Amino acid sequence: MNNFIFGLELDLDSIKDLNLPVKFMEFIKVANAASPKKDILVINGKEYIVNNILDFNKCAEHENFFKYKTKLSEFLNPNQIPFSRDSFGNVFLLDIGTMIVSFYNHETGEISDLIDFDSFIKILNGNA
């Protein structure tokens, strides 16, 4: 069951050199540049809004993963990648080493660890 709308086909050549984990690759193939049907997530008692998944195609004009990665590079550790955003300019990050999802608050510059990637996807899909 696809829990996303308005997604774009992923050009696998765009991401072949990123060494992304298999679980994340499977997710991004389905959710590239899409908006989740369930956009309000409750994680550890706090609400987060997922507006859309970033577009991982190199040629993307809007919500381009590569532009976000460059823009946020000074704030991220080497294993963190941006993969989604909310409606307010904040960004969800994934540590591809630990598979922990974090939240970057653009107003404060703070990064908070939220939850492991599998649990994040379960909540996003309405299964938790």
Where are these regions (language model features)?
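Functionally constrained cores in energy, signaling, and assembly domains
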Residues: 16-18, 80, 102, 116, ...
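Solvent-exposed, non-transmembrane amphipathic alpha-helical segments
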Residues: 44-48, 103, 114, 121
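Short, compact, well-ordered microdomains
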Residues: 90-91, 95-111
